[in-house]
């Protein structure tokens, strides 16, 4: 079983805990990680881009001058793409970029991401993270104690005081354990998770 140290907010070691082998000691699948991250990024896209083709722009399709005898290049329509106010060639249209990923692959990717953080010594377990009132200074102090410039903080339950304390810090984010996803785990250098949140993660994936 993987063993990690538990720290307090000041960065001092409190104890050691054993993690679930199934969750934090799984075999890493780089292909699953890649496919799930690509799918997550694709699913974030709005897909609302749109432009008009030559058949959709306003104005008539009148032929600007006769075909022969003017000395100028032949033109068929004043709404052809090469004209000002003309239509767009192969104009983008609204589309759905969503990629469906099998549940088993999502699970494999999640376990791979969690295991990689343990293997790379990038997972930091906190005994608790309680703040009486929103205070960015407290979170900054904690991040400095762990030398964490880019960190994902995972809490057991959504906490407005913690959320408001973190939201103004560039390079840091907070997320409840039930919203944990592969992209966010890999995006940040440090994976800071409370002891209670670890239990929740193991409860879901063990």
UniProtKB/Swiss-Prot annotation:
Record bears the keyword Repressor: no
NCBIfam families per record: rplD_bact (TIGR03953)
Function field: One of the primary rRNA binding proteins, this protein initially binds near the 5'-end of the 23S rRNA. It is important during the early stages of 50S assembly. It makes multiple contacts with different domains of the 23S rRNA in the assembled 50S subunit and ribosome.
Disulfide cross-links: none
Gene3D superfamilies: 3.40.1370.10
Superkingdom as given in the UniProt entry: Bacteria
Quaternary structure, from the entry: Part of the 50S ribosomal subunit.
Family designation: Belongs to the universal ribosomal protein uL4 family.
Region of interest (Disordered), residue spans: 45-76
HAMAP family for the chain: Ribosomal_uL4_B
Protein species of origin: Clostridium acetobutylicum (strain ATCC 824 / DSM 792 / JCM 1419 / IAM 19013 / LMG 5710 / NBRC 13948 / NRRL B-527 / VKM B-1787 / 2291 / W)
Protein name, as recorded: Large ribosomal subunit protein uL4
GO molecular function: rRNA binding; structural constituent of ribosome
Keywords attached to this entry: Ribonucleoprotein, Ribosomal protein, RNA-binding, rRNA-binding
GO biological process assignments: translation
Name of the gene encoding the protein in the UniProt record: rplD
GO cellular component: a single term: ribosome
Coiled-coil intervals, chain numbering: none
